[in-house]
């Protein structure tokens, strides 16, 4: 873990500490009591599933020197750092401990597109000569290596420690995915963000947020609070929620780069798709740019342009950035071409796991489909049940042949999940085993057909059960697709 010893008085200035308390050495931070060691500061946060306040005694027994917690919490045996918002206070203290961070830090939020924007932005920075990294669903990626952090937005200690490590490795530019969960729980607070992007907004995570209004409010926190006052917001203007986001950006006084057919800063004038990518025409500051983008699909076009907007927002040169767009590589699990069947059908894998994401993936592949468009997908267990029939309806309306299968059933009955999806797609085929479903589609698809395997993308496992009974069975859609053509 990065970070060197610092005094509690330096990390927690303004908390009314005694001279003796100010001199306490701090050796680390933790939000998990099992990771606390002597000299650590422990963050005790009330949570949706687990209450960190229940683990204060365990943290003190493990050597915690201070506890960040709400005023009403009783603490004996350690310094009580009182905070009405303990998550934010903890993040600010941890940031002082783990600093310095890379000088250029950007973030991206949105229901869909975060991972693609983060990876494409990292690529653009790298192509234009910067040492860059991305943090998110695919893990931590640099030009030289990559490693997993376990979730889209890791806990704040892992995040800040990671940023500190990247700075020590001479990484100057970092982009991270700011998920609604992460923003709501202050998991990526502390480090200065000079640019932030918005991709899209549609139904997802209602099992956590409860309503679409609270879900959007979580995402808006990036623009209301996280981007530095002198920072820049990059907005995909063609999304229905863009008007709301832009209003928040303007109220805050941030600089704005809007992008899309409806935009002023970077306007998409024309787009012509072919089997290898798309030719696009952009209008920027009165200049016209014709660019050959080597990515397929309208949604990857929008993601690439948002990534380019972030590069410009962080000091990039327009002509260099436009030239770099022609050199982009596809993102793992995002409309990734997996294989070609023995009959000549093209097979793609995509992470689409929301109604809007599934629609975008199918619509992206339709112009390239000469024959039938097959879709193999399912819905995750222990997640928003309301989106299941919606996804079924979208697949049924937009694809030619739909196979409903399993996708991380977790603690729910897999057959029940499939049944709820089939409400929206009553004529769809049902094949429970994901491998069997993929094999069936690929074996039957003909030359000119396209098979889309949706839901998992880059994921390497099928999650069965919950809690102590949870198992992650090895499963990779791309690998299984390749096995189907052997």
From Swiss-Prot:
Pfam families: Mur_ligase, Mur_ligase_C, Mur_ligase_M. Carboxylation is probably crucial for Mg(2+) binding and, consequently, for the gamma-phosphate positioning of ATP. It is found in: Cytoplasm. Its cofactor is Mg(2+). Transmembrane segments: none annotated. A motif (Meso-diaminopimelate recognition motif) lies at residues 407-410. ATP binds at residues 110-116. Gene3D superfamilies: Mur ligase, C-terminal domain, Mur-like, catalytic domain, MurE/MurF, N-terminal domain. Keywords: ATP-binding, Cell cycle, Cell division, Cell shape, Cell wall biogenesis/degradation, Cytoplasm, Ligase, Magnesium, Nucleotide-binding, Peptidoglycan synthesis. The modification N6-carboxylysine is found at residue 219. UDP-N-acetyl-alpha-D-muramoyl-L-alanyl-D-glutamate binds at residues 33, 152-153, 179, 185, 187. It catalyses: UDP-N-acetyl-alpha-D-muramoyl-L-alanyl-D-glutamate + meso-2,6-diaminopimelate + ATP = UDP-N-acetyl-alpha-D-muramoyl-L-alanyl-gamma-D-glutamyl-meso-2,6-diaminopimelate + ADP + phosphate + H(+). It is an enzyme of class 6 (ligase). Pathway: Cell wall biogenesis; peptidoglycan biosynthesis. GO terms for cellular component: cytoplasm. Belongs to the MurCDEF family. MurE subfamily. Catalyzes the addition of meso-diaminopimelic acid to the nucleotide precursor UDP-N-acetylmuramoyl-L-alanyl-D-glutamate (UMAG) in the biosynthesis of bacterial cell-wall peptidoglycan. This is UDP-N-acetylmuramoyl-L-alanyl-D-glutamate--2,6-diaminopimelate ligase. It comes from Zymomonas mobilis subsp. mobilis (strain ATCC 31821 / ZM4 / CP4).
